[in-house]
Swiss-Prot record:
Belongs to the TACO1 family. Pfam families: TACO1_YebC_N, Transcrip_reg. The keyword Cytoplasm applies. This is Probable transcriptional regulatory protein VPA0011. It is found in: Cytoplasm. Keywords: Cytoplasm, DNA-binding, Transcription, Transcription regulation. It comes from Vibrio parahaemolyticus serotype O3:K6 (strain RIMD 2210633). It comes from the Bacteria.
Length: 238
């Protein structure tokens, strides 16, 4: 069948693996969110947002339904959140969020990702103070002043509103996520929000190039291969 088929098959396998990783990640998050706060999205706003985000990322309905059914059944694994911090290649700062049913295993898996690229895992608080825990919304627009005034009128504690190349980005404390989203949807019902998430925003970025850039990409790939890793935040400027 030739070399081209082998390359295509490898590419398809990689794509399939990436999809399975995304489905697994959302399955865990939806299961835990429904188990802790109830499986009715109308009564559990965090779950409602998570399901909407999963659908936007093209997670199949059966994956979502299976996670909800599992939560309703009352059994299943008890995943707990785990957060690890450390220093990545090139002097970067990294936060790794996990959901795990075995903390010791997950710690060792994440630690090995650091070790394999000559990086160092740190203690709690070692780098998180260099990030702001923010709600971030991004959408197309030209008038950032109107957005800022609207949110302030609704008593949203806005951190910043940026306009760049026809894209508006709103930053607010992570505790203001639903208040910000509700205010935007109420004031601009036809607005399409392209990004809506709670994330860690680095206060400063660290330029990474050459060998350090290669190591950093390898580091991200290693973390992506860890089943328990849900999110990776960093300040690398690649």
């Amino acid at each position: 069948m030739g070399r081209s088929f082998e390359v295509r098959k490898a590419s398809m396998a990689k794509t399939a693996g990436a999809k399975i990783k995304v489905y697994s990640k959302y399955g865990k998050e939806i299961y835990m969110c429904a188990k802790n706060g109830g499986s009715d999205p109308d009564m559990n706003l965090s779950l409602k947002h998570l399901i909407a985000k999963a659908k936007k990322d093209q997670v199949p309905a059966h994956v979502i339904e299976k996670a909800l059914d599992k939560a309703n059944g009352g059994g299943g694994e008890d995943y707990v959140p785990a957060r690890y911090e450390g220093f990545g290649p090139g002097g970067t700062s990294v936060i790794v969020d996990c959901l795990t049913d075995n903390g010791n295993r997950t710690f060792q898996d994440v630690r090995q990702c650091f070790v394999k690229v000559g990086a160092k895992i740190g203690v709690e608080g070692s780098v998180s103070h260099m990030f702001d825990h923010q709600a971030v919304f991004q959408f197309k627009g030209e008038d950032d002043e109107v957005i800022l005034e609207t949110l302030m009128m609704e008593d949203v504690d806005v951190t910043d509103v940026e306009l760049e190349d026809g894209v508006i980005t709103v930053f607010a404390p992570h505790t203001e996520f639903f208040k910000t989203k509700t205010a935007l949807n109420a004031a601009f019902p036809d607005l399409t929000i392209d990004v809506e998430e709670i994330t860690f925003v680095p206060q400063t970025q660290t330029p990474v190039a050459g060998e350090d850039a290669e190591k950093f990409q390898k580091f991200l790939d290693l973390l992506d291969d860890c089943d328990d890793v849900q999110q990776v935040y960093h300040n690398a400027e690649l």
